[in-house]
Amino acid sequence: FERWGTRNHGYLVKKLVDHSEETLIKLVEKDGLLLQYIEVKYRTENIYLHAIRQNPDALQFVAEQTNQMCLECVRKKGVTLRYVQHQQSDICQEALKQEPISIIYCYTPTEEQCQLAVSIDGMVIRCIDNPSQQVRDIAVKQNERAKIYINSPLPTQNQ
């Protein structure tokens, strides 16, 4: 495969005669994104695991995602949270620890998740809709420049 260059890999994978798990694993170990060209009927959990270990973005081509697969991906690359089919709190937490900007891929970020994200990178406040005062305070404490994304104070109960 090396001599063909990366642009032709998808075509070559489709033309493969040997669809053994061993051969397919060798392919995805070279480039995890080749998973997209492997027919679903030949994919196994083992092939999925090798693909996502080589490139966490391969998660987008995994039909049957497990919690463990998703955790492995977001621990390496937080923004792969966007490919997680069934987000759970622990997966979101791990993604945020790795890359706080992945808050934009949380379906419904909790207060705790927002606090975690801004405690690591205060500038992430710009990606949070209607942050609580506590989230704002944490963001500014982490990075003074986060103030530029905090437009106005939260309404008080008297307003």
Question: What do these predicted ranges mean?
Answer:
Residues F1-Q159:
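Alpha-helical scaffold segments
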